[in-house]
Design a protein with these regions (language model features):
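Conserved helicase NTPase motor core
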Residues: 4-8, 13-14, 19-23, 33, ...
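Conserved glycine(s) of the Walker
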Residues: 29-30
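A conserved segment at the C-terminal end of the G1
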Residues: 35-39
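Non-catalytic alpha-helical coupling and interface elements of nucleotide-dependent molecular machines
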Residues: 43, 72-80, 108-119, 137-149, ...
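Conserved P-loop NTPase-based nucleic-acid remodeling module centered on helicase motor cores
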Residues: 51-157, 211, 448-452, 481
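Short, glycine/acidic-rich hinge or "gate" loops at secondary-structure transitions
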Residues: 82-92, 149-165, 466-467, 494-504
């Protein structure tokens, strides 16, 4: 007896020839659906596909092993129904050699196949965690000893400013954190150079372009949008026959100020909009001829008090200085940050050299060396474009399937893009995950990659489609309702990058 798939699960299983993002909540049958999709791809139709023409990437080796086993078991089940099927017999054999793998293992495969494109010994090995930790410590010690010996004023000022306790307290951690973050970018040196350029540009326009200023302004616009919605509701209550009509002029004035904050595009426009957001005392309400509903009066009054408190908090947090004062402060601190970038870059070069001496690579190396194989840098403009090797790999895979996509980072995104067929006009990447379960930001995962697609892909049939699986087949209704009650209250776009709504909540899929 076949599985009774839901409508959404069938869509995931049967959709083809597109980039497909699947937002799969906990207990929604994600793995079963993924396996069924693969089985259908290699068994359905007059010309069924081959398992070796699929690239299936999982987050852990254990997940890859489980996926391979489940696919093999599903093929064997099909073979029992049709034992003479030569294609299925071949798939049962080839599943052991198929690219069902972690991204690190796939990168290692690329390096083994294309080591001639790189300046590395083909006999390299991947160092274990303990070995790399010791080597990293040796390199850091050597680096700091060297810099102390130079008596460089910028370095000495940096140490004096940021060292804690005796000796180098904390300096090595700062250096390694910047190095580690740079490695989460596809081209680390370019990221460091871009940071230097940003620090060197001290114009007002440059201030507005900085990442932290954009974050601040986006937060302001988001809050102002929420206030505008609440004030529109308050204005509606004021306009009703038994509403507090005397409050309406002030509420409309507040709404106008909130709308101005929604439109801020730079720090100067924010200062002007926020400074002008004042809250004069509400007019007295007298209902001689048309008594005012006390509940409506209270709702409007409380709404305004709540927004006033939030606006005052925002002013206290963000209206701390003029643009000129901020730029002066940044100029004063930029020397230390530039020194930190130099130290991180120096550490990267030394660490790389030590690893090459020992013919070692670490997991960062696997990904970045794979990018060297898959991309070539244009001489003019420095743009990175997929290489011939990338084009060959793109031709080998009919589809790329990525599990736990919410835990991908920018490096992995660049790798996936290089071996996909999107640049040829035939997108073929299947991504499944749940941004609500993203727990690896401390490892520099970028759940915003998932969110960008979630917000830009359409639910309609298209080349860039998203499908949501929110039915839970694992837990009882009472458990789901309790879970939803908690997350409706605590998961907001500001806190978890996505709002927990009726659409994204867990719904019972089994009685």
């Amino acid at each position: 007896m076949g599985v009774n798939w839901t409508k959404e699960q069938r869509q995931v299983i049967e959709s083809r020839d597109r980039n497909l993002l699947v937002s799969a909540a906990a207990g929604s049958g994600k793995t079963a659906v993924l396996v069924e999709r693969i089985i259908r791809m290699i068994t359905d139709g007059e010309r069924p596909g081959d398992i070796e023409r699929l690239l299936v990437m999982t987050f852990t080796k254990a997940a890859a092993s489980e996926m391979r086993e489940r696919i093999h078991d599903a093929i064997e089940k099909k073979l029992k129904e049709d034992p003479g099927n030569e294609h299925l017999q071949q798939q049962a054999i080839m599943v052991q050699y198929a690219q069902i793998t972690t991204i690190d293992s796939f990168c290692l495969h690329i390096l083994r196949e294309h080591f001639d494109c790189l300046d590395i010994d083909p006999a390299f090995r991947v160092g274990d965690e303990g070995e790399m930790l010791l080597l990293r410590g040796d390199v850091m010690e050597e680096l700091l000893e060297d810099w102390y010996g130079r008596h460089d004023p910028a370095f000495e000022n940096f140490v004096e400013t940021y060292a804690s306790g005796k000796a180098d307290g904390g300096i090595d951690d700062y250096i390694y954190q910047v190095y580690s973050f740079s490695q989460s970018n596809p081209w680390p040196k370019e990221w460091i150079d871009e940071c230097r350029r940003e620090l060197s540009d001290t114009s007002v326009e440059a201030l507005d372009r900085t990442g932290w200023m954009q974050f601040l302004l986006e937060d302001v616009r988001r809050q102002a949008s929420e206030w505008a919605g609440q004030l529109q509701e308050a204005a509606r209550l004021c306009s009703e026959e038994d509403g507090p009509g005397a409050y309406l002029p002030m509420i409309l004035s507040d709404l106008s100020n909130a709308e101005k904050l929604r439109e801020v595009s730079g720090y100067d426009s924010f200062v002007q909009a926020a400074s002008g957001f004042e809250f004069p005392k509400l007019a007295a309400v007298r209902g001689k001829h048309s008594p005012v509903n006390p509940d409506k009066k209270e709702k409007v009054s409380e709404c305004r008090k709540r927004i006033k408190k939030a606006v005052e908090k925002m002013k206290g947090q963000f209206l701390f200085a003029s643009e000129e004062e901020i730029l002066a402060d940044l100029a004063g601190s930029s020397e230390a940050v530039l020194m930190l970038l130099t130290l991180a870059e120096d550490f990267a070069g030394r660490f790389e050299a030590k690893k090459r001496e020992r013919n070692l690579v670490d997991f960062n190396d696997l990904e970045h060396l794979a990018l060297q194989v898959l991309y070539r840098e244009e001489k003019e403009g420095g743009e990175h474009r997929p290489s011939e090797a990338a084009d060959l790999l793109a031709g080998q895979f009919d589809e790329i399937l990525v599990d736990e996509y919410q835990d991908s980072n920018l490096v992995q995104e660049a790798l996936i893009r290089a071996v996909s067929r999107e640049r040829f006009g035939t997108p073929n990447v299947f991504m499944v995950g749940d941004v609500k379960q993203s727990i690896y930001k401390f490892r520099l995962a970028r759940p915003e990659l998932f969110l960008e697609k979630y917000h830009s892909y359409t639910k309609e049939d298209s080349l860039y489609q998203k499908i949501e699986l929110h039915q839970n087949f694992r837990s009882r209704r009472q458990v789901l309702e309790s879970t939803n009650d908690v997350f409706y209250r605590i998961m907001t776009e500001n806190l978890g990058s996505i709002s927990y709504t009726e659409e994204t909540a867990l719904h019972p899929g089994a009685s």
